[in-house]
Structure formats: C-alpha cells, structure tokens
Amino acid sequence: MAFDKKLLEIVACPVCKGKLEYDKANQQLICKADRLAYAINEGIPVLLENKATPWNEEA
C-alpha cells in the first residue's frame, strides 16, 4: 500500500508538533526540527517517539 501524501496535511511530529516531510526513497516521514525519521509501514506512518530513528540530512 502506498503512502497517501494527503496525510501530510494532518499529521505532525509527535515530539514538537511540527511539520513532517515525506522521504519517498526511504519510506519515512522526517522532522527536520527534531532530526527524527518515522518509518512508514505498508502505507501507515508509525508516529511513535520511541520508534523514531535519528535523521541525518547528509545520509
């Protein structure tokens, strides 16, 4: 199942409540403010702070 980009209008980072960006190549949502990446599993974003991974812009 593909991620529906319309979700970006309503989802927010669970840590800072900021905007998330879609990383299609890695199938994750990125919070640049907190430098965290949230996985997307079967089209569903896993927006749990304890499941987030550190995000590095250069990676």
UniProtKB/Swiss-Prot annotation:
Coiled coil: none annotated. This is UPF0434 protein Shew_1640. Pfam families: Trm112p. One of its GO terms (cellular component) is cytosol. It comes from the Bacteria. Belongs to the UPF0434 family.
